[in-house]
Amino acid sequence: MARTIEGMLTDPGGRFAIVAARFNAFIVERLVAGCDDALRRHGIDTESRLDIVWVPGAIELPMICQRLAASGDYTAVIALGAVIRGSTSHYDYVCSVAAKGVADASRDTGVPVIFGVLTTDSIEQAIERAGTKAGNNGAKAGLAAVEMASLIRALES
């Protein structure tokens, strides 16, 4: 029988960081609150073990995520933001740069860096994903961080 290794939704220990994009702050603040709540519900004392770093926008997320993950101070880093489609191709560029950069930060450092950036066609969709009809994607990102950090710990033991 094959051995199964998976992360758990229990406190893996260590510190966590949220890197939040200030652009569309009225949405992102809800994502940050949802993430904080999810971490607390899973045993992380966010008063002492969570740092929240604000950057101007989604394009700036990867650089700070990379820096925090490479510092060795964090068990997981969570990137949160909201990119809402406009009438130009700028949306596609921002989404692509942010997603690839966050993935690269995780791969390059070996630290879970979770992509919790909303990429929506409308403000209404963003609001739905920030805590109304579609749940809170910030909370989902927080859970992914806990599970991935737990999985990394399991793989190292």
Model-assigned labels for residue ranges:
Residues 5, 91-92, 96-157:
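C-terminal binding/interaction regions
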Residues 22-23, 81-83, 118-122:
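Short, ordered loop/turn segments at secondary-structure junctions
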